[in-house]
């Protein structure tokens, strides 16, 4: 094993990377509330894992979506557990995200030179809410359908471009298969990729700038 490690160490400088990760200075004022961001990230990992598992059985069609969710809950081994974990970790992620935003704001973590870290964080908050909006409609039950109809109808109040935005979101004039397909695509591909890129940027800036000092 020593030779294998030495081979990788010579090429990747693993020890230097490990030292950089483990030797960052942590200010003495840091408390448990500074862990909320990490909890939010943990919830996201659970979302990715459980969501990926459910994509094997979920069918994004208006005729089969609800039945496929029922199948996951009643027929798939531990399907009920995966969906329950997905649902509860989604709620926990939103809650932790809100608490994290409040913690950063109240402790002044958004001030110079961390403005861009704050911007990426707020953008991540918008992405998180978008996860909730798109995922809520995927079972395509009565609640999901009407929630989708209401949410996609909101932009209609915008002058000039309102109707175009509604049709862009729905994929049609009315809510239907095109809408469900777009929500599924956004929920399982567009938003996860956006979240991953934003999180990587967010974490790199935190590593570079460190934790903000006390007020």
Swiss-Prot record:
Its main location: plastid. Keywords: Chloroplast, Electron transport, Heme, Iron, Membrane, Metal-binding, Photosynthesis, Plastid, Thylakoid, Transmembrane, Transmembrane helix, Transport. One of its GO terms (biological process) is photosynthesis. PROSITE patterns: CYTB_NTER. Its cofactor is heme b; heme c. Heme b 2 binds at residues 86, 187. It is found in: Plastid, Chloroplast thylakoid membrane. The chain crosses the membrane at residues 32-52, 90-110, 116-136, 186-206. Binds 2 heme b groups non-covalently with two histidine residues as axial ligands. Heme 1 (or BH or b566) is high-potential and absorbs at about 566 nm, and heme 2 (or BL or b562) is low-potential and absorbs at about 562 nm. Belongs to the cytochrome b family. PetB subfamily. This is Cytochrome b6. The gene is petB.
